[in-house]
Amino acid sequence: MKRLAVCIFASWMFPAAWCCTPVDAGDLDAILAAENAEKGVTLQAVDPVDDMGFSRRVCLDLAGRIPTGKEISQYLKWPADQRRDKLIAKYMQDEGFANRWSAFFADMLRIRSNEEGGTQLLAYVHNAITTDMPYDEMCRRMISANGKAGRTPEIGFVLGDDADPMALASATAQVFMGIRISCAQCHDHPFDKWTREDFYSVAAYFGKTIRRENNLTKTVYTTEQDKSMVLWPPEDESEPDARSPMKPSFPFPYLDESERLEFLTRLEKLRANKEAEAAGNSESGPSVDDLLAAAGSKTKQRLSGGFGAAMKVSTEAKSDIRKIDVNAELYKRSQLRDELSRLVTSPRNRYFARLLVNRVWKDLVGTGFVEPIDDFRDSNPASHPKTMDYLAEEFVANDFSFRWLVKEIVSSDAYQRAHVALDADEQERAALEQAFLATPMRRMKAEAMYDSIVTAGHLFAVKHLPGENPRVIKRRIRVPVDPDPNESADGDGAMEDEPTEEMMQGEMVASAVNYGLEKSIELDFGALLSAKDDTPMIDSMKKMTREEIEAMRMKSMPQQNNPRRRYVSKLVDETIDDNPKFSSAYRMATPAPAGHFLRLFGQPSRVDLGEDRYDNSSMRQALMMLNGRLTHEAARVGPLEPVYKMMTGANPDFRKAVRYTYFEILTRLPSEDEIAEAIAVIDAGEDKLTGMADLRWILLNCNEFRFMP
């Protein structure tokens, strides 16, 4: 504990070369300063975080992990007055940028991999960030789409709420505009101006959308029906025969079309330059009736032409049939949701841009302009409305570029400021943070902490030689048992999951133990976005009877275990090469299962609207870090790591190894006292490498590692 305390409370010492040269965000900083002056704020801003702290902060916020030793060394070689700009540019292009911000949008959109279309929607968002798809286009597609997830991944947003008009009305208003209208589903909003009729008018945009399931493939998709399911007045206010379909309307304030605002003019000019590239891409194909008529006409024209002509007729007819847009007929577009998507994402809808600006500002700076971040109402005004509106208007003028928004914020003084000193007065701390003159303490997000441990421990690749670490583990297997003909077979083939004595003794059992609660299923975003063409199957099914479809479905089902056979489970020894490597937490099925590392450190379940990540500490978190496999594997020293070479051979340099270890794990160099303490830890180990593993374990478990500078 003494060594752990030294790590947690050790003083920070930096070479003079690691100076503070903040990047200039221009007008944003000036507008924020002017707004603070108008509010009568006279407090002195905290100094910018030092260069090493900035490199750690910006890498976590842009790439979703701590920087590697090589990255830090490269950063320090850049000229002091350029390194922050260069670092931001570097990590904006890092492949981790899309991974990290996909998790941000997964929280916002409540993406759940275990729900229909969830994994495809996550892949869609990841691709949108990678390509810098305009944010309004990304959202417009999600609101208006119909189809199945394999072909139209953005449909996951509608499927996430089971195509329920009431749930989608609440989600659309709160997720995309920060308007909590759900309360008005049952009664007029008690704290805001929205009425029950307003709620139903928004729900009516989704009233014709229905969820269906293919009888054979069990594929779930959405399409449109003729009549709306949303009726007015509500069921509890009128007789059934007095209700009629509700007329859709958009009750939210809107900038008047006659207003010619400068930021909208800039947007129009920017989009005009892009129109030529997009021209012709939106033309729809011929309808089913048109193509069938054309195919029939060609057949009639050539019937008298003999065998060769008949073959040509057949070939051309098949070619024409293949062009039929079966999906357009099956997955009908929603005119109502097309209209709603344009209204929600319009540049003249201030709620839309303001909300995303508020979300991203809160995520990066630590405090939102509006809190809670998705609760915009007259009685909950923004703390700095001019600064928020400046960012929102510039975001729109830059064609809703999400990358532009992130870069603008991380380049600002507000983002780059350090924390208030630990011994400062609490009221002063709160005032500085509310005025964005200091940044609040932020713990790493769960995924960032996971990937940072993997990065610090060199676990994205193997770090031991093949066969170097044989290990015997207990694996649970299921064994069939032939039933006794004199007794009924009551086994159903289920795995026995009662804790075994071996589990209780702490041995590693592959089936289920807390020791392995850090891993999960890895998602392949590219494969998820590769549409599978099932048009031929759909076309053939149209000619089949219901009985034929059911017979085909039963034939395609996997064979079930013999219900008359009993199964027992047993533990067997298995020798493995204990040389693991870990994949990124951002590529896991999400949310992770309950009890997983990510869930313990704040990843939400994404079930309810407005569900935030929590950053509270808990005993389970501490136990996961102290005893979990991820921390254990990261602490182990492998011969393929740089620090191994520093500690072995004819001339080991333990002082250099300690400095490098601090450099990699905490993104700083240790003080002389810390070096002395660290060498004592190394000397106390069974051998030097075990002692270094102890030191790395201590550093990974200290508060300094978990909290951002």
Question: Where does each model-flagged region fall?
Answer:
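Positively charged n-region of N-terminal signal peptides that target proteins for export
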Residues: 1-4
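Bacterial N-terminal signal peptides
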Residues: 6-17
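Primarily short, surface-exposed interaction patches in extracytoplasmic proteins
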Residues: 23-56, 67-96, 110-482, 488-490, ...
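Post-BTB helical module
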Residues: 60-61
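Hydrophobic alpha-helical transmembrane segments and adjacent short intramembrane/lumenal linkers
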Residues: 170, 583-584
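Active-site beta-strand/loop architecture of penicillin-binding DD-peptidases
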Residues: 596, 600-620
